[in-house]
């Protein structure tokens, strides 16, 4: 590279910067940046300032990474973070010795260190290439192309893989060509085709002739670039090469959704090796657009004779041939891609479990047979699994992107994989895109990323509400962008690159480009479930479970997928038209069938109104979706087709939208209409919310009356939820609701389930109430799922990402609508119109929670005896626990039913979980979490602890399994109180403190037991509370704390998003805060079967809701663990585990019951009043952050039997939340440890920290509020004090500065006075000398008033100048005197040509005649100084009257040889220590200090001119004659001053002139030039530097004695005319 020319370097820089811009702007580069360089006035290429700035602040790098991984977390990194990220990804930035890559270097913008930035850009290019071509993607493509079972050589690099891809494509094309030739097809000219000799591709050098690049395009796009247009010669000429590469360029510009060719044809042809990386990136982009996200123009004709049927999945590839409907359906359904590829790792694909693979294999033939039939029969509703299987049949034709992601095929549970992945080398296939590589755990990343993504999506969408519709890609502006970037199957939703949901969101969701990857499969469902953090964990297990189920039967498999399809991701997929989901209320009904709407009977009118509103909202949403879809299409017409997922989901959402080009409306119109719709949706939502609240209140009363009938009522509620939700869902394309995806697959069931009503938050986000998992046929099939159990459905539902809870979800749906007052208010004030939450930033999770909340309330009356459920669950869970997908953990089997517990109390284990899921799904999991439990702002630390607990795989849960409940003790999905979660540091500190205290107190040992007990108690309490706050608890609980944390705890509370990355924190268990003894006691109760009484105590009065601000405003320890609202106080004490339990408790129990109690406590601080929490009198922890009075660490189950309710609740929690999680979650070391603790804790987890609902009386709420106000006041005071201290410091500093300035001025003033004094003395002395000299020479001064003038002049002009003496330099370039000085004595003044001093030659110190040759020669000896030159006049040599400073370098002579005229000045300035040769007065000057005045003699520059003529003007032997003549003329002349005339600035001698300063006459003595030169003729002036032997130009307008040479205007030379512009060229000025 050392040898590379500037041209090559510039070409590479241009191509690389263009590539960077395309990726940073998601392939939509602004027009003004399409060409990154511009040419400046010197014709130099410069990078545009905007790009320089964005390189300097790392914006472009951040955007590139964010788009590449669909992860907004990359948006705020600095250069160093980016370099570290690249290194973690296995692409270290190359440094050179001369250019280290550091933040300091990269941040520079003036000048920009382009080489350093090139290193970073090239590393990004390598990363991009690796990510796109990593794993088996390329291998799968090669297999499809070649038709054989190609196996990539081990150790093959991504570059070799890409070359192999091109090589195989060219070989396949050659086969095709041979067939054409054999068929005798003529070419365009009618002549017979001949088989071309396609050169082999061994390295990138072979691509430089453009043949293989063009043929590659011809292979994929034969209609656009026929192979006959490629010039193939054995010895390619440069012309042919450029022609071929031009084909590539034109194809890129005209036929691809965005240009990928950033090089010019010449770059490729000539640069060869130096452009290799740019070529690699070009191939990568082409691979992306041909294989991963095929562009419109891509078709695969005659893939080895296998032309995909239009309805075959291959047809998907052959996009053109497939009817959009079928194709899309197929694609959306075929997430798995080819079965054969089951073990192929594709980032874009979901994980396939062995079971699922097995089932797929078994089903493959069957499905193949049904393939076309199915496509036609259920183009829209087709089950993903079916379509997948079908697709699998045609695997050879499936583009690599359709293949399952490795994770899908992965046998390991998600949790296991997650644990593994985080440690994996970033370049490994698995982890490449995972955020974990960036330092987060997968879980965290998922929830977090998803949450943020959702948020961003919402923000980025033209309309917030519209977001779900065509999910705006988080960071990506569009699918195209998304597609352009690596959407390797990562969900945008999932913050993690790979999000556990691995499933790139069911394509439906198309959240981000990732969604586009169809690879998401049912397995992904489980992943989809992961949207809820809880769901995710559970899903990990559930993945396996699903796969097992799927293995059992195709239906089961599909169902499980469907269930998981509930996954927010999957829901979006929405196979049927927008209304299809809602249209299939049957699905809901399947599960809910029994529950008629009896529970709603009381609110039938409200329901009717609400239904109408929902219908209206649904229509608006549909319209909005259409518009958004159209907008997206408009933006990315090309991309849509290339992205099957998008197509899929668009078709699903709206068949009419099939054509990507569909109604391209102006962006403005789209945006306006969307904005209007959002407003309408918000209004409707608020109305619905209000209705829901009323309804829920009515229901709450009703429920109290009908607690015995809860089971039926629940069913009814579910039905209602289904129906109403259906409209909601229908209103929103399931796909839009990332979380709703859950049931999308469930639609697979014969009857698409109506999606619960989707709520559009104030933010316009769709909130879908949770949908019952029942959609899944499995649910129906499984007895456990029996609706009566609700849990049973849950069991199946559990498979759904959300856990079986989807059914509950339906109940949760109510939450969407508005949570009954008793339900937990997702938004701290559920009762308030959602608008109130709006400020908080209600996410759909909120809305969903609200709806679910309502539903739950409604359902609660019908809630089956939760305890009974729990018991059933307990048993079933034990049985099914292992099988149950982790998601089910949230809503364990029938136990899951506890959803309501959760919902009502913890939503029961499952119910709450479901709600949670719902919420989480709807919001980012984190969001949901926070919203759920944080809605009150008081989410408990629980989220933290839950997270931690959740995190732990909870192997111990298995231990607890028998108990089931204990297992559930921590509902991973349990919502966590986020209120406690504030800053990461706070959380960490809390956890540390808690852990330490636990260790010190040995509480941890008991914590598990107690926690479990506690949980049981709490569950009971929660149930009660749930009744009071069911909605809230459930949502909180549902939030798997683990999930939350795993999700990095992005907690959104209101407008605040707290990101708490605590991926591996040990979970705090509720017990941790408990007294160990109490815990032990509690543990006993745990075993007791939960009683079947589900206490739903809905007080008519809604508990006072803590002020919403609570959440937003946190004291420095921002959210202490929920358990310790006090935690500020308690933090040290509370242990992390405890916290978990606390959280569970606080947040409606980690276990659901924990969550119930706590969230209830917290959430509903108001609601808590209703619930009976068991308090352990002894432990009173006071959470500052909770509204409640000091929370008492309740040992809910001090006696195991403590209260059946608590046991039940505990049981439910444990079972529903914990078991699945435990079994499924892989344990991180911490987790294992904790898990074991948790397992025990699960048993013992009885500790409930939180104010009992009974405790929460209005006074305590007031007290809490007062406390909050107090805290706020304190913080305000602190802030004020800080500001005052800051102000004081500033004032002091300014005073100090003032004093220093005054001192400085004083010093300067004294100096000036001293100088003035010295100047006055000097002037007097000078005057005296001048008079003496004049008398000596017998001359009289020309002007009698010379003295006065001199004095006045010196006093006026010297003083200021003297100040500059300090910095004096040799002599000024010119001596120019102001008028005052000129007047001093015309005789002596030489500075102004018009008033040259008197002709009298005042010789001061020197006795030599002023024009003596010797003295002239050594200018230094010159003593004829005019008055003007007096040091006083120019005390600083460098400053002349006009203020110009002559630098020593530019002065004509070195100091030693300074001419007399400057000498005096210099000597004064320098202290006259310089020894000037030939100057007799030097010694005198040295003695005197400053040189005294002497009557200046007319100066002569004779010596200078002689020197110039000798050494400069006529150098060398050639000019000897001319030199002699000039020297003679000078010798003969009597003139004192000589000037040389030059032709121009080149200093070519033309003539010698004499100058009379007195008369300003310039007369020619010798040479060529005008005989007399007038002032107007002068052009430039020069003076001679006798030391440097050169002339330097003097920028002055007048001739003075300091000038030694000049030029005259060009026009004066004969034959030269000034070039006037021709009139023709002149612009006509009108």
Curated annotation (Swiss-Prot):
Interacts with msps. Associates with the minus end of the microtubules. This is Patronin. Belongs to the CAMSAP1 family. It comes from Drosophila melanogaster (Fruit fly). Residues 404-419, 495-507, 1335-1348, 1450-1459 have a biased composition (Basic and acidic residues). The modification Phosphoserine is found at residues 422, 431, 441, 460, 463, 466, 494, 496, 513, 530, 1034-1036, 1067, 1219, 1228, 1398-1400. The keyword ATP-binding does not apply. Its main location: cytoplasm. GO terms for biological process: asymmetric protein localization involved in cell fate determination; centrosome duplication; cortical microtubule organization; cytoplasmic microtubule organization; establishment of mitotic spindle asymmetry; microtubule cytoskeleton organization; mitotic spindle organization; negative regulation of hippo signaling.
